[in-house]
Amino acid sequence: MDLTVEPDLNSLITSSTHRWIFVGGKGGVGKTTSSCSIAIQMALAQPEKQYLLISTDPAHNLSDAFGEKFGKDARKVTGMNNLSCMEIDPSAALKDMNDMAVANNATGSGEFSDLLQGGALSELTGSIPGIDEALSFMEVMKHIKNQEQGEGDRYDTVIFDTAPTGHTLRFLQLPSTLSKLLEKFGEITARLGPMLNSLAGANNVDLVGKMSELKSNVEKIKEQFTNPDMTTFVCVCISEFLSLYETERLVQELISYDMDVNSIIVNQLLFAEYDEGDSCKRCQSRWKMQKKYLDQIDELYEDFHIVKMPLCAGEIRGLNNLKKFSQFLRKPYDPVADSKVIYELEQQD
């Protein structure tokens, strides 16, 4: 029996069970291009399904990649009926939270009401470390709740264009961290529930009930994130020492979280030995270095899908260019037969 792992993402792209796909790695290795490519190929392969691509990176690039503006509300990609994009904006989300708090306390008086009216809540929460990851996590919870209750837009799969590795690991730790915190909170509320509810204010907010509901939602997410049929992580790297080192750290962390990870996209490969005519010495030298680390990647991750993507002559921006580039996620790039594609990318204004 042939146990060779295919050097493509066909099994993921045609998957009928995955609900959450995370795409991440070191900064500057092509995470956004890779996440856009995966989302496009999934949408093309299964036109009857709806897909949502979310950027959780504070330095949003989805709008730049597609050449059209996306915001905090999901919007269809022009030219694709089953792919939507959104960029989670922490500052806008915090403003919404502050406005909601002001509205709920509009009849209140005193220092707390004045604090809210002054926007101090958003200023305070905006400075909390990890707030970007927490807001992204809230977005995940919102989608799970909407799908269970049949509210809002329904998406079969959500693809995350994540922040660089450190932010992403904090995001993925949130289910376990929140679960532990809420367990402790549960112990406290068992004794002090009525008192806590009375402290929630005159608006009759059932604080204990809200926390209990939050705990239930967090447990559902934790369960789904550790189910390999529902969630997977695609690592993105380039063939250099620092990127390889960070990829290995990321893989080990994901394994410790019981998350499925079995795919690596290696971007910006030169394939210089296949260049027509005399290739420049710098390209040949760099390709020699890339091959050295490619060999290490193949050896380290022999049971992974290793997808080797070429360095293109132009920018991979706009839907048409992304479609051309993303085809190599399904059909491995052939440096001889496919070399002209990397020179055919359309110029974007």
From Swiss-Prot:
* SUPFAM superfamilies assigned: P-loop containing nucleoside triphosphate hydrolases (SSF52540)
Q: Give the CC-aspect GO terms.
A: GET complex; Golgi apparatus
Q: Keywords in UniProt for this one?
A: ATP-binding, Cytoplasm, Endoplasmic reticulum, Golgi apparatus, Hydrolase, Metal-binding, Nucleotide-binding, Transport, Zinc
Where's the active site on this chain? D57
Keyword Transmembrane listed: no
Note the InterPro entries from the entry.
Answer: Anion-transp_ATPase-like_dom, ATPase_ArsA/GET3, ATPase_ArsA/GET3_euk, P-loop_NTPase
Keyword Cytoplasm on this protein? Answer: yes
Q: Which Gene3D superfamilies match?
A: P-loop containing nucleotide triphosphate hydrolases
Residues that hold Zn(2+) according to the record: C280, C283
Q: What biological process terms from GO does the record include?
A: tail-anchored membrane protein insertion into ER membrane
* Amino-acid positions noted as binding ATP in the UniProt annotation, renumbered to this chain: K26, G27, G28, V29, G30, K31, T32, T33, E240, N267
Q: What subcellular locations does the record give? A: Cytoplasm; Endoplasmic reticulum; Golgi apparatus
What do we know about how this protein assembles, alone or with others?
A: Homodimer. Component of the Golgi to ER traffic (GET) complex, which is composed of GET1, GET2 and GET3. Within the complex, GET1 and GET2 form a heterotetramer which is stabilized by phosphatidylinositol binding and which binds to the GET3 homodimer. Interacts with the chloride channel protein GEF1.
Identify its protein family: Belongs to the arsA ATPase family.
- Described function: ATPase required for the post-translational delivery of tail-anchored (TA) proteins to the endoplasmic reticulum. Recognizes and selectively binds the transmembrane domain of TA proteins in the cytosol. This complex then targets to the endoplasmic reticulum by membrane-bound receptors GET1 and GET2, where the tail-anchored protein is released for insertion. This process is regulated by ATP binding and hydrolysis. ATP binding drives the homodimer towards the closed dimer state, facilitating recognition of newly synthesized TA membrane proteins. ATP hydrolysis is required for insertion.
Q: What is this protein called?
A: ATPase GET3
Q: Which organism is it from?
A: Kluyveromyces lactis (strain ATCC 8585 / CBS 2359 / DSM 70799 / NBRC 1267 / NRRL Y-1140 / WM37)
